[in-house]
């Protein structure tokens, strides 16, 4: 079977924004965008940028039945993404991330060409899905640290939105096996790598290798009881760009190296969950679920969490969920 889909999107951004004159000149906007200045207040400029983005998306796929519960799928997708307001206009302290973020009025739309291949096996007891993909993105938009800036509120790292030509490739694995009517085991694993082909550097903020295993026990005769234990293993990201920079410390009149690039160590988490039904009447029941995440109270930091520089992730936590059905 062959499937084809096409979509067109039009985005228009009309905005008014104040820039500090010093920042405007520092970013080189006085040469490229002098025509959008509508008022000059000396230390500040009021500008009125307007951008139009035309986007076309196309997807086509070919599936083939191999017989004996097996099939393969090949897919090609073309997509465009217009930059959002943050990527264009960010210009100051991002309070929730404790960093200064700078957008760029020159940012263009992204164009992605993605090809993928998927193998499926689906039987009464087992399900296996393996997918590999390759994605070439022209004008890939990303956010990267470039230095430090001192303000009256303190010193903050500066992150800037940039664009490069990039490739992303990886694989996903999903497996489920029913041992018997009561026990099921599952595995989900994912791998991904990103490369800046413009300068042959690794991309920032790429997920590391992750594998999750789960064992579930179910007995419908015991008030629809189920219990499961989940193991989540996340490896350390070993492919990352070096964006470290030096910062001046006035108290010691010296420079120190700020290691903003090194990813945190690998970590392993155990999670457990159990649920069952409490019957109230013939038509009413309450589904009770109890779970413990991070059972071993592991100290870890997630590489993609923008607050990982300041604190660990949440430790052991308990939750109870009640669902009333009627």
Feature-to-residue mapping (PLM):
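Transmembrane beta-barrel domains of outer membrane proteins
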Residues: 1, 61-65, 108, 118-122, ...
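Outer-membrane beta-barrel translocator domains and adjoining extracellular loop/strand segments
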Residues: 14-21, 86-91, 98-100, 141-148, ...
